[in-house]
UniProtKB/Swiss-Prot annotation:
Pfam families on file: PAH, Sin3_corepress, Sin3a_C
Annotated source species: Schizosaccharomyces pombe (strain 972 / ATCC 24843) (Fission yeast)
UniProt domain PAH: residue ranges: 178-248, 345-415, 504-576
Location in or out of the cell: Nucleus
Residue list for modification Phosphothreonine: 446
Swiss-Prot/TrEMBL keywords: Activator, Cell cycle, Cell division, Nucleus, Phosphoprotein, Repeat, Repressor, Transcription, Transcription regulation
Annotated SMART domains: HDAC_interact
Entry protein name: Paired amphipathic helix protein pst1
GO cellular component: chromatin; nucleus; pericentric heterochromatin; Rpd3L complex; Rpd3L-Expanded complex; Sin3-type complex
Record's compositionally biased regions (Pro residues): 328-337
Record function comment: Has a role in modulating the nuclear import of TF1 virus-like particles. Essential for viability.
Chief localisation class: nucleus
Entry GO MF terms: transcription corepressor activity
Length: 1522
């Protein structure tokens, strides 16, 4: 590798062989290199900037280039070339101003003579002759100088600034191209890899580009563009890439800015390309409209195929046999055609492309003909069919277009010789120039054709067939029919990316000033689209479409602000300023002018006082000069958007176009007939000689030429029209009678067809006229479909509520509700019920039972809520929906059920609405009960299941129907935890929330289903109300507007029934007709389109509001079904019915009503309040949060204060206070701890044994809260008494509890703190062996009274201890007297006014049962003697007696039945004990308390008597003993 990068000290060696990798034969001075050069000593890349050098003397240096850029060492002044082992290397001649790297040479005397390339295969030869260099240069174009010609590129032969220039100029001498091999490609790849060794992604992207080109994914222009953008900033790589480009393509780099994309210019055969800063490749648009990418994609393909038949590694267009780099070089260098032949071929290709476009435009209405033409060309190119067969097929295809056939002959080789005899007679002679365009061929070769190429397949050039793969044969046709689908990918065709600015080649344009001007114009315009428009102007000028004055005038738009370019352009076109163009006046700033509406501005007076010679006094009076149109758009970027037409307007426009076309042709034909009739009358007066010499001008003696020519073309066709026109001009005496007769015949035919079409047009016009006026109908349906869904309605409610909260936090005043609806017309509510009834009968998909339930609910609920008489719903909402029952039976049953009318709507609703709501609630509860009972017991009949629930509801509702006292509250006043008085600032009492007052607002609390039902209901109500308000307008339209009598006489005015296909309903009002149409739609008598047309006949463009009435009713019924089948809502409606019938209410009642509703729904259901104001007939809807107040209409501070305190003293949570904001008012450490294991049975036994049975609560505390101090003040003499019921957790057998209590008692009694406390050992020893019989026997007591008197004190102390223990056990006292436990944040004890919640003991009221029976205790002691032998021996008789008394008392107390453990406890009494309920009345509780007190008193008295008797028998103990 080091050998390959040898360095050479130029000028020190005298022999050519001494330069192993460089040979110099140039004797002139050297050129200073510039830019970044790479130095590779020892294979280590180093990048440095070349120092400046000067050329002090000598002629201007001539630069020399190698095909691979040299590597320059600035320190030693050496230039290093890589040894690529090439035979011959030719270089291009760059512009010296570009400053590229040149070869450093020594003095001329030290340079060797030019070597021979054949003798040194490893030497790179650089020619010193400029002429020779020009002849030998390859396709690399590294110069931007316009003075140097660019062989290999196709440029115009005529200057765009000089019209009618002779294109026939002597071509330059032919060029020779060095055959590239695989070594050149690999060397370039190594250079790219070395340049980007630190950026491998760029090298990989370059390889991807080459792979895409090889796979035919992209084409040559795309490759050049992407490589230029990839190597931007590396001019040596871009210049080196020119070596591999096909002829006609080159990349040039501007010397001003070689490192940016703006300095890169790409030249293609189709025109120049520019790469802007954004990386987009732009090019001038095609001059003759848009052309298909098919011929453009093949233009360079055909050129390259004709220029070179051998394979060489240039960027050829992708083909199946073309590779990116061919590893096998050609054995010999190919021969290229001269430049004039290539230019001629390019011209022929342009003509072929234009011909294909003409064929496509001609057969635009017959695409199959155009596709057939392309198939013929493809078959010729692929299958190499004979040219005679091609011509025969094309002649049949173009039978109706002889002009295309004549033009097609120009592309055929020797048609007159090779065509069949029958075709030669019909064809004309091939033009001479087409024959000369075809080069001579050998007899064995296939004739080369100038047919337009299709896709990427060029016409066959050799006789040997080249079959393509099958998958490739169909590809060009698909691309042609689909207009090149590949343009949608990153690849685009040459015609689209590089549109031609000129149709003629520009290779012979040698005017450097023009090219320089175009370059400056491109840089000045910057915008590629503007530059393309400028090129179009130049092309039109070169074609003499307009003169130089018009060109200069139009170019002011592009270069008006650049005086230099305008003067340059005038010099190029030799503009004569004899008729100077007026300087454009500055435009008026209309934004500063006075406005009139959004679209007009008033011009200043200086703009109004302008002379005008063509106006008279009337024009100055009438015409507007002051106001100009200046619409104000929504945005400066957005232009004016025309009104979007609907499909019916489009139909009318098409109809008018067809009608206009008929009228235009008939009118023009009539004018031509009149003109020819005048000439025919004139001709009758002429002699034969005058007729023979008579001619007509081009306008045939009329005022216009185009009108008559169009009529001739319409009647005779375009192929014969010109001949007829010439005959009319040259021989009118013979032609006019024939043509006149033909025109009159056509006039009769066209008028007959017009009459036939008028009938069809009239029908189409009637069907589309009213629909075309309805611009809101289509959009209304789509919007209404989204806005009536439950999801949309619920989200709208929540968004409004959230927005109101935000506004309220900002201090803004917001209403308490989210929606406020008005129901002023009760008749519309009746009409809605009418539509509901029709839909339930004809359109409902629910069962008959559900329909009956919904109908009953609607009758009762609508009358109850909206204060509408119940009788008005009976004719429309049937009570039965059985299939066997007819409508007459249903109506009669409804009338039988009809009650007597009442004058008061509320009273009427109370009588009838309640019964219907009761029926609905019965069915709802019944259905839920049936579902539950069917799972539990299958054998229970259906009747037995329904009867109890229905009777319960009847019983529940009948209780409130009997209550007619308005002052009595339906709901409970609510339990309060404290008695409170509300006082004002002056000490007067305020309302505590229990005062009843008259009301006009009735609340209905519901969930989201009920909310959606009300929203949809009001939507239907509002639309019917809007339609009803249009009654006067619709009535005037039907009766006041009279039809035109002429139109009626001609049959142009038809009755709406004839157009609709059915008769409109007859009614007194138009609104009634609309309701009947809605009924007929739901009944299925008319379809949706007929329904809409009928509404348009009644209301015109305002009828769109009822287009979706059927879908809206369907949505309402769907929500109604979910409401009536919801069991929770059934209970809520029961609460609403109880509140609705009351004319007076209080805030506390409404709070309790809301609490009951929330309880019925549960905590997860969203709550909304729908209230009805009977005075204003308005309904408000508001979303109820947990923190929202029930009464949202409080105004004064006193009302708000009383409302808050009234909610505060209730046992329910205070309204307006969130639960998370409530602070617990006691310490958690004071709560009883539960350290034991709940699963441990012994722990449960302990808890149950220590449980307190009785509970007591007496609430008598009263307080006062003044409004001014907000401090609680308690009333004197009031208090609260509370005893709680402990938690009983054990439900096992009672024996375990008894045993546990006895063991604990005996353990304590025998301890030092028990009965032995304070006694001496002798006393204990004496008392311990005693028994109960010995102690309490009468004889023993009498005889031993004196002896034991001394021990009286000790026994008395023991007796007192036992009495105290018994009292403690009997009274149920316990050491732990903490607060009762909380259940779900609420106390387990409910407070009341002096209410004792003791549980009944269930014992017999007989006093004898409460006394201690010692004999029974002895028996019981003997029965358990075996179980407690050890403990029995250690206990004294007194201890045994005390323990037995305690056990008996505990048993008596614990046998009180409990709702959890009573079933497991044995009955200790001889009489039957019935368990008491959980909650008893005050009277029963008082009786039980009295019994319990008596029992306890008797037990205590008996114990005291026993102990007193014992004390009298014993002696009084001494103080020491005590």
């Amino acid at each position: 590798m080091a050998k390959d990068w040898q360095d050479a000290r130029l000028g020190q060696c005298h022999r050519l062989e001494d330069y192993s990798n460089v040979a110099i034969n140039y004797t002139g001075p050297y050129l200073t290199p510039s830019g970044t050069m790479a130095y590779h000593p020892g294979n280590a890349p180093l990048f440095t900037q070349a120092p400046p050098h000067t050329n002090p003397q000598g002629p201007p240096p001539f630069p020399l280039f190698n095909s691979i850029s040299p590597v320059y060492d600035p320190a030693t002044g050496r230039l290093l070339y890589r040894n690529v082992n090439t035979q011959v290397s030719h270089t291009a001649i760059p512009n010296p101003a570009n400053g590229y790297a040149a070869v450093y040479g020594g003095p001329p005397s030290q340079l060797p003579p030019p070597p021979q390339p054949q003798s040194h295969p490893n030497v790179t030869v650089i020619s010193a002759s400029p002429a020779r260099a020009i002849e030998q240069q390859p396709t690399i174009l590294s110069s931007t100088d316009s003075n140097i010609p660019r062989p290999g590129t196709v440029k115009s032969s005529a200057s765009p600034f000089v019209p009618n220039q002779n294109p026939s100029a002597p071509p330059p001498p032919p060029q020779e191209y060095r055959q590239l091999n695989v070594t050149d490609a690999l060397s370039y790849l190594d250079l790219v890899k070395l340049q980007f060794h630190q950026e491998p992604e760029i090298y990989n992207e370059f390889l991807d580009i080459m792979k895409e080109f090889k796979s035919q994914a992209i084409e040559t222009p795309e490759v050049i563009t992407r490589v230029s953008k990839l190597f931007a900033g590396y001019p040596n790589l871009i210049q080196g890439f020119n070596t591999f480009l096909p002829p006609g393509y080159s990349i040039e780099i501007s010397s001003a800015d070689p490192g940016s994309l703006a300095g890169i210019h790409i030249t293609t055969p189709q025109g120049p390309l520019m790469i802007n800063d954004l990386g987009k490749t732009t090019a001038p648009p095609p001059p003759h409209g848009s052309t298909t990418p098919l011929p453009a994609a093949a233009s360079y393909t055909s050129m390259n195929m004709k220029q070179s038949s051998a394979s060489h590694p240039v960027l050829q267009p992708p083909a199946p046999s073309t590779l990116q780099f061919n590893p096998s070089p050609s054995p010999a260098a190919p021969s290229y055609p001269p430049v004039d032949a290539s230019v001629k071929q390019a011209a022929d290709l342009d003509q072929a492309i234009n011909f294909v476009n003409n064929v496509k435009n001609r057969f635009s209405h017959k695409p199959e003909a155009y596709n057939s033409f392309l198939d013929i060309l493809k078959s010729y190119q692929h299958d190499q069919r004979p040219i005679q067969l091609v011509y025969f097929q094309v002649s049949q295809l173009f039978a109706e277009a002889p002009d295309l056939l004549e033009e097609f002959k120009r592309f055929l080789p020797d048609v007159s010789v090779n065509a069949p005899a029958e075709t030669q007679d019909k064809s004309t002679v091939v033009p001479q120039e087409s024959a000369t365009a075809t080069p001579k061929r050998s007899p064995s070769a296939t004739p080369t054709s100038a047919l337009p190429p299709i896709g990427k397949f060029a016409p066959p050039t050799t006789a040997k067939a080249q079959p393509a793969p099958e998958k490739r044969r169909g590809e060009p046709a698909v691309q042609t029919r689909n207009h090149s689908k590949r343009t949608r990918t990153a690849t685009s065709s040459v015609e689209e990316t590089t549109p031609r600015a000129f149709n003629v080649p520009i290779a012979q344009n040698k005017n450097p000033s023009e090219l320089e001007f175009l370059e400056h114009a491109r840089q000045y315009l910057a915008n590629e689209s503007k530059y393309n428009e400028f090129i179009k102007l130049l092309e039109l000028y070169s074609q003499e479409v307009f003169d130089k004055n018009a060109l200069v005038e139009r170019c002011y738009v592009f270069f008006g602000s650049n005086e230099h370019l305008m003067n340059w352009l005038k010099d190029l076109v030799k503009y004569n300023p004899a008729n100077p163009i007026p300087v454009p006046r500055p435009r008026v700033d209309l934004t500063q002018c006075k406005s009139c509406g959004p679209s007009y501005r008033l011009l200043p007076k200086i703009e109004l006082l302008l002379p005008c010679s063509g106006r008279d006094d009337l024009c100055w009076t009438i015409l507007n000069d002051a106001w100009v149109s200046f619409p104000t758009l929504a945005s400066e970027d957005s232009g004016f958007i025309a009104h979007r037409k609907n499909q019916f307007e489009e139909n009318l426009h098409k109809l008018e176009e067809e009608r206009y076309e008929y009228d235009r042709h008939i009118g023009a034909n009539m004018r031509f007939i009149e003109l020819l009739q005048i000439h025919a009358d004139k001709m009758l007066k002429m002699s034969e000689v005058e007729k023979a010499n008579w001619t007509l001008p081009s306008n045939l003696g009329g005022k216009s030429v185009s009108i008559y020519h169009k009529v001739i073309k319409k009647v005779y066709g375009k192929e014969h029209a010109q001949q007829i026109i010439e005959n009319l001009q040259k021989n009118p005496s013979v032609t006019i009678p024939i043509v006149l007769e033909r025109l009159k015949k056509k006039d009769r035919e066209w008028r007959s067809l017009q009459n036939h079409w008028n009938e069809l047009w009239h029908d189409i016009e009637e069907k589309n006229f009213y629909r075309s006026l309805d611009h809101q109908g289509v959009s209304f349906k789509s919007v209404d479909k989204k806005s009536t869904t439950p999801k949309f309605l619920i989200s709208e409610l929540r968004n409004l509520a959230q927005q109101q909260k935000v506004e309220l936090s900002e201090g803004k005043v917001t209403p308490s509700h989210q929606f406020l609806f008005s129901y002023k017309d009760p008749n519309i509510i009746t009409d809605i019920a009418r539509l509901f009834g029709v839909f339930l009968i004809h359109g409902s998909t629910h069962s008959a039972e559900d329909n009956e339930k919904m109908s009953n609910f609607l009758r009762s609920f609508l009358s109850l809520f909206f204060d509408v008489p119940y009788d008005s719903f009976i004719p429309y909402l049937p009570t039965h929906f059985n299939e066997e029952e007819s409508d007459i039976d249903s109506l009669s049953s409804s009338l039988i059920e009809k009650p007597r009318a009442s004058s008061s709507p509320i009273h009427h609703a109370n009588n009838n609405g309640l019964r219907l709501l009761k029926d609905v609630l019965k069915k709802t509860y019944r259905g839920a009960r049936e579902n539950r009972s069917s799972v539990k017991e299958d054998y229970v009949s259906e009747s037995t299941e329904r009867t109890p629930d229905a009777s319960e509801i009847d019983e529940h509702i009948s209780e409130h129907e009997e209550n007619d006292d308005e002052s009595s509250s339906v709901f409970s006043t609510g339990e309060v935890w404290v008695n409170c008085k509300f006082t004002d600032t002056d000490g007067s009492l305020l309302d505590d929330g229990t005062k009843l007052s008259d009301r006009s607002v009735y609340n209905l609390f519901g969930n989201m289903s009920l909310y959606c039902f009300f929203r949809l209901f009001h939507t239907l109500y509002s639309r019917l109300e809007e339609i009803k308000n249009l009654e006067q307008m619709a009535y005037s339209k039907q009766h006041d507007v009279k039809s035109n009598p002429v139109a009626v006489e001609l049959g142009l005015v038809r009755h709406p029934s004839e157009r609709l296909g059915f008769a409109l309903p007859t009614a007194d009002t138009v609104y009634e007709q609309a309701i009947q149409l809605c009924e007929r739609l739901m009944e299925g008598e008319i379809d949706q389109n007929g329904f809409e047309d009928a509404l348009r006949c009644l209301y015109g463009i305002h009828a769109f509001r009822l287009y979706t009435v059927e879908k809206l009713v369907t949505s309402i019924i769907k929500q109604l079904h979910s409401v009536t089948t919801n069991r929770r809502l059934a209970q809520v409606f029961m609460y609403y019915e109880k509140d609705r019938v009351q004319r007076r209410t209080s805030p506390r009642q409404q709070i309790m009503y809301r609490i009951q509703t929330e309880t019925a729904f549960g905590p997860d259901e969203n709550l909304c309040c729908i209230d009805w104001n009977s005075q204003t007939r308005q309904s408000a809807i508001r979303l109820m949060g947990r923190e929202d107040l029930t009464m949202g209409t409080l105004k004064s501070d006193a009302e708000k204060w009383c409302y808050y305190i009234g909610s505060y003293i209730m046992s329910s949570p205070t309204e307006g206070i969130l639960p998370e904001h409530v602070r617990i008012p006691f310490l958690r450490k004071c709560l009883p701890s539960d350290e034991g294991n709940e699963d441990d049975e012994s722990s449960s036994v302990v808890k149950s044994a220590n449980a307190i049975i009785t509970s007591f609560l007496e609430s008598g505390l009263a307080l006062t809260i003044p409004i001014n101090t907000v401090k609680i003040r308690y009333e004197n003499g009031t208090e609260d008494v509370f005893a709680r019921n402990s938690e009983q957790v054990y439900n096992g057998p009672y024996d375990k509890i008894r045993d546990y209590r006895q063991s604990k008692w005996r353990e304590w009694l025998n301890s030092d703190e028990g009965w032995t406390q304070g006694l001496s050992k002798d006393k204990v020893r004496r008392i311990k062996p005693c028994t109960i019989e010995s102690l309490f026997n009468e004889s023993t007591l009498r005889s031993g009274k004196a002896e034991r008197f001394s021990e009286n004190a000790g026994v008395e102390s023991i007796g007192k201890k036992g009495k105290n223990l018994l009292n403690e056990s009997g009274n149920g006292k316990k050491l732990d007297k903490g607060l009762p436990p909380k259940v779900n944040g609420k106390s387990s004890v409910t407070r009341g006014n002096k209410t004792n919640l003791k549980a009944r003991n269930g014992r017999n009221n007989d006093d004898s049962s409460n006394k201690i029976n010692l004999s029974e205790k002895e028996k019981e002691k003997e029965s358990i003697e075996d179980e407690e032998k050890n403990r029995e021996g250690s206990m004294s008789p007194v201890a045994k007696h005390a323990s037995d008394v305690e056990d008996d008392h505990d048993v008596a107390k614990s046998t009180a039945p409990d709702f959890e453990t009573s079933s497991h406890r044995p009955e200790r009494s001889s009489e039957k004990k019935s368990p008491s309920p959980v909650f008893t009345s005050v009277k029963q509780t008082a009786e039980n308390d009295a019994d319990n007190e008596d029992d306890k008193t008797d037990m205590d008295d008996q114990t005291e008597e026993t102990l007193d008797a014992d004390n009298t028998m014993e002696e009084e103990p001494s103080k020491d003993d005590l």
